[in-house]
Amino acid sequence: MDFQHRPGGKTGSGGVASSSESNRDRRERLRQLALETIDINKDPYFMKNHLGSYECKLCLTLHNNEGSYLAHTQGKKHQTNLARRAAKEAKEAPAQPAPEKVKVEVKKFVKIGRPGYKVTKQRDTEMGQQSLLFQIDYPEIAEGVMPRHRFMSAYEQRIEPPDRRWQYLLMAAEPYETIAFKVPSREIDKAEGKFWTHWNRETKQFFLQFHFKMEKPPAPPSLPAGPPGVKRPPPPLMNGLPPRPPLPDALPPPPPGGLPLPPMPPTGPAPSGPPGPPQMPPPAPGVHPPAPVVHPPTSGVHPPAPGVHPPAPVVHPPTSGVHPPAPGVHPPAPGVHPPAPGVHPPAPGVHPPAPGVHPPAPGVHPPAPGVHPPAPGVHPPPSAGVHPQAPGVHPPAPAVHPQAPGVHPPAPGIHPQAPGVHPQPPPGVHPAAPGVHPQPPGVHPTPMPPMLRPPLPSDGPGNMPPPPPGN
């Protein structure tokens, strides 16, 4: 066969296959695929005759190879014969009886009525769990019969319209009628001891009890109030620490500026009548009490009425380096300054220095050139925020207001005394108040300029120096 001169053929290669060759190759390929999925040895219509060819007993066809038979089985003729044979066999085959269903024999008895019952509602005292106890009387129950029960949904019964809020508990025993109890549709607690039944054969009584599950946890029981005078137990510890003690009802607020705390108010009943003057502690022996410090009127305060003498201005001692007189030492007379520390007084017969000339105190620098010393009898202004006090003398309260109209300030040399305490000064010597220079009788003090005004209590004792040590 000439494969080289065919149309489409190439020199050195095989020629184009004919249609018969293509069909043979296709049938072989299909046979291999069919053998992989179909086992012809199990086909009831496949048969190989004595000539070596294959026959189809259903269609009575002859095939030379297995591929031809497999192709026949997928054809229309073979499939039609299969359907015709199946219909014929189904028609000729005898009808087999259907499998019998299990039938429940219904017991037939004469009903004698409804049994007696008793329902008890119960509630657990500890947990607060609700339960129901049923007692059913079956005095005429049949021999060998035990009462039975079951829960039925509202959708199973046909007596009432279905309501999902309710369910039914059925009780049955021959020859009595079946009775049902309508209970709330809540979940039943089937735990041990929560659901139980009992049949008493002697009294012919049937008992059933069940509990509903708790929907919400019970609230903690409150402690009962004990009799008056009996203290309740302390609360439990929080994180292992005891509770904080209760604070007093009326605690005064802390004073501003670091001042000492005021005394606590009395807890007893308030005394009747007008309030008296504030009680001051008695002074120490040899120490004269200070005169009441009266501040000049600030802005917004009306001046005193005509004929009323203004209070004496508070004049503080010089700046640091000059200490106030020690306790028990009386200040000098008006216009005479005390000697500085470490300077002895002049001996008898020695004249003092001229008026207006003061010896320099230790630690006080001389004035710079061009600075004139103060005139005799004129004291330098106090430094800002310096309020020295003598040891043992309490500072005045920061809430002392100017005197009312018609009240004269104390005369120079007269000091108020604490109630019940009368210190005796030396005869003929009248001590002056600390920081206040007395004025001769009949001479009124001149008002102080605003620049020399003493600091107000609102300025705070931030720059107050400590008191000097006692000698």
From Swiss-Prot:
The keyword Heme does not apply. Residues 1-27, 217-471 are annotated as: Disordered. Signal peptide: none annotated. A zinc finger (Matrin-type) spans 54-84. InterPro entries: Matrin/U1-C_Znf_C2H2, Matrin/U1-like-C_Znf_C2H2, SF3A2, SF3A2_dom, Znf_C2H2_sf, Znf_C2H2_type. Its main location: nucleus. The modification N6-acetyllysine is found at residue 10. The modification N-acetylmethionine is found at residue 1. Residues 217-295, 303-316, 324-383, 437-471 have a biased composition (Pro residues). It is found in: Nucleus. Keywords: Acetylation, Metal-binding, mRNA processing, mRNA splicing, Nucleus, Phosphoprotein, Repeat, Spliceosome, Zinc, Zinc-finger. Belongs to the SF3A2 family. Component of the 17S U2 SnRNP complex of the spliceosome, a large ribonucleoprotein complex that removes introns from transcribed pre-mRNAs. The 17S U2 SnRNP complex (1) directly participates in early spliceosome assembly and (2) mediates recognition of the intron branch site during pre-mRNA splicing by promoting the selection of the pre-mRNA branch-site adenosine, the nucleophile for the first step of splicing. This is Splicing factor 3A subunit 2. It comes from Rattus norvegicus (Rat). The gene is Sf3a2.
